[in-house]
Every structure is written in C-alpha cells, then in structure tokens.
UniProtKB/Swiss-Prot annotation:
Belongs to the ABC transporter superfamily. Lipoprotein translocase (TC 3.A.1.125) family. GO terms for molecular function: ATP binding; ATP hydrolysis activity; transmembrane transporter activity. This is Lipoprotein-releasing system ATP-binding protein LolD. Keywords: ATP-binding, Cell inner membrane, Cell membrane, Membrane, Nucleotide-binding, Translocase, Transport. CDD domains: ABC_MJ0796_LolCDE_FtsE (cd03255). InterPro entries: AAA+_ATPase, ABC_transporter-like_ATP-bd, ABC_transporter-like_CS, ABC_transpr_LolD-like, LolD_lipo_ATP-bd, MacB-like_ATP-bd, P-loop_NTPase. Residues 9-233 form the ABC transporter domain. SUPFAM superfamilies: P-loop containing nucleoside triphosphate hydrolases (SSF52540).
Length: 233
C-alpha cells in the first residue's frame, strides 16, 4: 500500500443518480478510489458501465449525488463554480476521444490556449507550447491547422494542450477510441512516457483491456460498481 503522502485524488463513497421525470437511474454505486501522484491508472468497462460519468465527476464536470472527491484534501464539489473552473484550468488536464481542437487556430495556438486563458505571458507560453509539441513528435507541424493533421496527430496536439499548464492530473476519456490500432498504441505509449518524465498522474477510461494492461494499475467497472484494483507494475 502506498503512503498517504502520495495520494493526489481520493474518491469516497461516490454515487450518482440521474432523474428523468419520475424515473431515476443509478449509474454509480458508492465508488471508492485513490489516485496517486504520477500514477497511470486505467478504468476499464463496457459502454454504459459508468466509467465516463466517474471521470466527469473527478473533473468537476458533473456533481455526485452523494460522496466526496478530494484533490489534495480539498473537497472539489463544495467549491464555488469559479474555484472549480480555476482547478480545471490549473490542476487538471482533459483528453477526449474527439480532440476538440479549435479549427481556426494552429497546433501551436491550440496547445497554448489554456495558458492564454490563465493570463500567462504570451512569449513564454508559445515557447512552452512549442517544446511540448516537439516532445510529442510534432515540432514540424506547429503552424498546421487541425484540418491539415491526421487523427493521430490531432490527438497528440490534444495531449500537449492538456499538459500546457503543468497539471497534477490528466483525465482521458477513450483517448484512442477514434484512432486506428497503430495510432492508438502510439498515443498510449506517449501517455506512459509523459507520465514518467513529467510526474503527471493520468486516469484513462477505456474499454480496451489490452491497452489498460500497459498502465501501472487498472480498476474494472460494471454496472456502476468498481472492482478491486489490479496492479501491473
């Protein structure tokens, strides 16, 4: 068991119920999970198992019906909307199945955008964005628009964007789901490499057990219930 000092995110008895008129559907059942600093964690489950909902709650994009989510001891869902937005921009990074890049901006500008929103120095931010794109193998594609990039290249830009503010935790929802096998493997390799080099924790939601097995640890979700974790290394 890892010491408490390495704990980054603690999810305690989190449940989620969706209401539709008189009907209610419980998608999470008292989930408990700890994410450690620099850890690479996979959440595996079939579609509709609740794994994406859990990821959204971890990122303050949705609120739990009950339970708590603590980031370095701070209860995320007791904070103001403004403070939650600050945490999403400063401490969390997000990667989705679809890259959500801004089509009118270059790869370099897309990566820099979260730092611009935070009001960071433009020249320094662009230099850091360039360095990140070089790190993900796209130093030669800085001025290209998303429409001029392949699917794998767009997702690499999205990964660089997620890291621009040096987050403590990156949340990735099916980041390879829209890619071919070769590109998907490259993206997972990049996630592992960056986690190890930068000390950033990654939580990756996926239905692909083979890819999840390459992470430090995986947990399995079925019908909103999280199973015991499996450590790989």
């Amino acid at each position: 068991m890892k010491p408490a000092s390495t704990r980054l995110l603690a999810i305690n008895a989190v449940s989620k119920v969706f209401h539709d008129g008189a009907c209610e559907t419980q998608v999470l059942h008292e989930v408990n999970l700890t994410v450690h600093r620099g850890e690479q964690l996979a959440i595996v489950g079939s579609s509709g198992s609740g794994k994406s909902t859990l990821l959204h709650i971890m990122g303050t994009l949705e609120s739990p019906t009950s339970g708590t989510v603590l980031l370095e001891g701070e209860n995320l869902h007791q904070l103001s909307s403004k403070r939650q937005a600050q945490i999403r921009n400063q401490d969390l990074g997000f990667i989705y199945q679809f890259h959500h890049l801004l089509p009118e901006f270059s790869a370099l500008e897309n990566v820099a955008m979260p730092a611009f929103i935070q009001g960071k120095n433009k020249a320094q931010t662009l230099a850091e964005a360039k360095a990140l794109l070089e790190r993900v193998g796209l130093g030669h594609r800085l001025t290209h628009l998303p429409s001029q990039l392949s699917g794998g290249e767009r997702q690499r830009v999205a990964i660089a964007r997620a890291l621009i503010n040096k987050p403590k935790l990156v949340l990735a929802d099916e980041p390879t789901g829209n890619l071919d096998a070769v590109s998907g493997e490259a993206v997972y390799g990049l996630i592992r490499e960056l986690a190890e080099q930068l000390g950033t924790a990654f939580v990756v939601v996926t239905h692909d057990a083979n890819l999840a097995a390459r992470m430090d640890r995986q947990v399995n979700m079925k019908d909103g219930i999280l199973s015991q974790s499996e450590t790989h290394r």
